[in-house]
Amino acid sequence: MSTEPVSQHDPLALAGLMQLVSPALPIGAFAWSQGLESALELGWVDDEASLGEWLAGVLDDGLTRCELPVLARVHRAWAEGDAQALAHWNDWLQANRETRELLEEEQRLGGTLVRLLRSLDQVPVTPAMPETPGYVVVFALAARVRGVSREDAMLGFAWAWLENQLTVACKALPLGQTSAQRLVERLRPALVAAVSEALALDDDDLGPALPGLALASALHETQYSRLFRS
């Protein structure tokens, strides 16, 4: 009897998701730290243990309550061609970006991804596209066009976030690649759990609770020396 795991994924859709979450995707995500650079400068994060606590907190009180459930909703809205829902959740998410840098990151990554997808003939002509689409909304569209399921798109988005944050930390901290991979192993189950929890949330349960990240991001706007744009 074979003990080999059986794939439940469309290989082409999986390859499309891997393309979307790749650090090589030319949208400039590497330039943004989402407040982590400021947390490093302030000494809130200074080693592997404190970085793990920071990332776990942002995942639990941020992505799980904000980006991931919104991604689930806009993935469905794209499938249904629901322009009203797309506009609502695009506006809601951008209104919850608590600093100029975080809002700029959302809008710039969204705009860059739209331009890339258009150059690849991957954006259908649709009046449902918001006027200033954010990254989450465009990521959901790209996943939908590639046949990526809602749950897989959410997990891929969370994975890309984690990988980017660890890249930031490795550049700005004396943090080695092995330490980064230990954090990946620690947080991989948390990413899966975050997707499940996000799917169970009602609309009224949504909203980030990250005052520390908001403060770090605000302070980053006037930080003297910076490697990253947020």
From Swiss-Prot:
Q: Which InterPro entries match?
A: UreF, UreF_sf
What's one GO MF term for it? nickel cation binding
Taken from the UniProt entry, a GO cellular component term is:
cytoplasm
- Name the Pfam families on file: UreF
**What is the protein name for this chain?**
Urease accessory protein UreF
Q: How does it assemble?
A: UreD, UreF and UreG form a complex that acts as a GTP-hydrolysis-dependent molecular chaperone, activating the urease apoprotein by helping to assemble the nickel containing metallocenter of UreC. The UreE protein probably delivers the nickel.
| Function description | Required for maturation of urease via the functional incorporation of the urease nickel metallocenter.
- The reply to whether Cytoplasm figures as a keyword in the UniProt entry is yes
The similarity comment for this entry is: Belongs to the UreF family.
Spell out the subcellular localization from the entry. Answer: Cytoplasm
Q: Which UniProt keywords apply?
A: Chaperone, Cytoplasm, Nickel insertion
> Which positions carry the signal peptide feature in this UniProt record?
none
